Amino acid sequence: MDPPTQSHNSVRTVPGSNHSHTDLIISSFLSFPDSSPISISNSFDRVLDRALASASADESVQDRLVDRTLELASLLLDSTRRCFRKRASVHNSNSWSLPPELTIKVFSMLDTKSMMQAAVCCTMFNKCAMDRLCYSHIDLTTSARYADKGVVSTMINRAGKELRSLKLGRVVRTAGSDSAAPLLSGSCLSPLAYNHGFLGSRLRSLRLYNLRPIKYRSLCDALSVCPNITDLRIVGLYNLTEELFNSLTKKCRLIEHLFLETYGYPRTLESKAGSSLVEFVTNCPNLTSLTLIRFGLTDDWARNLAESCRKLKYLNLSRSPTIKGRFLRELGLSCKENLLKTLILRSCPKLQEKEVLEFCNSLLTGNFKSIRQIDVSSNSGLASSDRGKRCNKPNFPLERLKEERSDVTFVADFPSTSSGKRYGVCDEEELRLIEMMEAEDDEVDEEDDSDDDTDDVSDEDESENDDDMGMGFDVDYLL
């Protein structure tokens, strides 16, 4: 009876009774006395040549012998590598001074890209990186090139009940052709709604940068399952509607820090959207920081926003194309006892010199007792009373302000174009980057009320270093 046919691509199965014999053969092979590589190589050649010669005249039999030899060599190499990794893991465990729980805590503080790089270093780090706590604060902004919807879903599900913050998209964008289209859109947030919104309810901070196209329905659906969110930042909004603010009013009343930035030509905020925005601020009792960049706010809307939130300490309305500053004097009369400490009005093309001067005088008379910082810096100066003219050297009573209100920092820098000095929209580094990249193409002329092109501004290509260390988010460590 012929023996059963064996696949030429597999190693012959050794019966259980022969395991010890096989182990002895392999042990004998591994204990081969030291010799020169050339001598060992020649020995292999001789033995293999004899085995092929004595096997059969049939080439297929010889082919199977060669394939089997190659597979044995491959298995030996794989086994050696596994042993090496085990030894390295034991070494790391003995030499790594932090206990696993503290290592997990450190990993949870890294951005997601850095954590994944650490995870592929060794088995010990990989095990630590699989803990849910490591995904409490998901930051994929440093790996936007690779982070598609599937990656986001995997990360959110890994975090599970430990999910606390989520940052997605590209922080910095540049003008020009879109050479690397973003992989994410508003629909990437759909995993937050799974299991009746359980994951979304765990979220405390959500920051989205330039997700396009972003559908308001998808965004509002995601926000509707995040009732405990306290920090919301969305950069790259377009066509502001009351739908977004209505959703925030109904579902996200615990927000303490709200940051919204639009792109494209900022139009005057529509009445419905403005009313919905004021309603949200009015019904958000914990709101202490409000940033609305490039919003087409009128002075009336700006005053209503400041008056509607009594706990507001930080207000940033930079790059508004419509604010003239009249709301400042009105605010001084109606909000003498409010808590506002910081007011930022950078790069507002219609902000008038006379209104800022009136504001300074209001400070000197004792209004705005809580104010500590004001910034009205602009790359193009302030609007002068003479129509069409700009003022780069306004006559503000700064010396008197320093003497009588030494607790106030008043910033009013208006660099000339030739100086090359540019001012951002906020104190935070990431927003200074945005301003630096967009300042050349995004300054709005005072007399220009025509619609600008609505072509999307492309995202900046990531550094080529992103390709290092296998940061395509290896599937072995994501699934």
Curated annotation (Swiss-Prot):
- Pinpoint the F-box domain residues: 92-138
Q: Any keyword Glycoprotein?
A: no
Predominant localisation class:
nucleus
Family annotation (Gene3D superfamilies): Ribonuclease Inhibitor
Look up the record and name the pathway of this protein.
Protein modification; protein ubiquitination
Q: Which GO terms describe its cellular component?
A: nucleus
Q: What would be one Pfam family of this protein?
A: F-box-like
Q: Which GO terms describe its biological process?
A: protein ubiquitination
Per UniProt, subcellular location reads as:
Nucleus
* Skewed-composition ranges (Acidic residues): 437-469
Q: Which domain of life is it from?
A: Eukaryota
- Region (Disordered), start-end ranges: 435-479
Q: How does it assemble?
A: Part of a SCF (ASK-cullin-F-box) protein ligase complex. Interacts with SPK1B/ASK2.
Q: Which PANTHER family match?
A: F-BOX DOMAIN CONTAINING PROTEIN, EXPRESSED, F-BOX_LRR-REPEAT PROTEIN 21-RELATED
Q: What does this protein do?
A: Component of SCF(ASK-cullin-F-box) E3 ubiquitin ligase complexes, which may mediate the ubiquitination and subsequent proteasomal degradation of target proteins.
Protein's name according to its UniProt entry: F-box protein SKIP17
Name the species this protein comes from: Arabidopsis thaliana
Q: Which gene encodes it?
A: SKIP17
